[in-house]
Amino acid sequence: MLQANSSNHEITVYDTTELYGEKGKFRVMEFSNKAIQGALDLNHPKRILFEYPRAIIHLMEINEPYFEDVFVIGHGIGTLAGYFAEKRFKIAELDAEVVELSRTYFGYNQDNVVIGDGRYILESEQPNAYDFIILDAFTAAGTPRHLTTSEFFSATHSKLNSRGSIIMNLMGKVEHDPLVNAIHTTLSEQYPYLKSFALPAEGAADIQNILIIGRKRPIQFQARQMAGFTEINLGQGHMIWD
């Protein structure tokens, strides 16, 4: 087991023989709030363990099968960029220690990660440059606020091409979650087409992964390919501004 401290997180990397009830041999990156940032099946390193990246992969492949350029905010262990190794990914990660650990302990071997704040890095990119923008960034308090505002979503819209999509991984409740509803409402001001998805939970009050995709064109998905995620209808919320 390894523990590392950065300016943003206390990070733990450890091996375990059980993960979410499954037996095997796994390596996990975890932050101090027990939030798992990534996990590797050491017996099958190419396997994607978690449902939400599998669902994101499906949304990418079905909505833009020939995509080439992706901007990601939040690196983790580099699951998506590793899966799509032949595509052009640019990843913004605030924490250099996360990137170093992904290379040392999780086999990440690409040279496409920029250290810094994802919003400011994205704002310096060329217009219409990307097919997808993926937001998968968390602090102990959740998704950083400046990555949920109308001004940020306007910037994402300008950096996507005419077929482009933003896909967000959030943590929240399916019903009556003021922040999730506010993010959804704010995003809808910039993108004419939105869909939201969640895994079935024990109760509406459970905190869980929620995926929201915003697109300039109609959104496609096949329910059986969504790794258990089902479409949900989020409520109306307030607008979020800088």
Model-derived regions: residue spans:
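Short strand-turn motif at the edge of the Rossmann-like AdoMet-binding core
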Residues: 138, 169-173, 199
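SAM/dcSAM-binding transferase cores
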Residues: 1-28, 36-46, 50-54, 58-65, ...
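Conserved S-adenosyl-L-methionine
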Residues: 191-202
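The AdoMet/dcAdoMet-binding core of the Class I SAM-like
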Residues: 3-8, 44-165, 175-184, 205-207
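General small-molecule cofactor/ligand-binding pocket signal
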Residues: 14, 112-114, 195-197
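Short, well-ordered turn and helix-capping elements at secondary-structure junctions
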Residues: 17, 117, 198-200
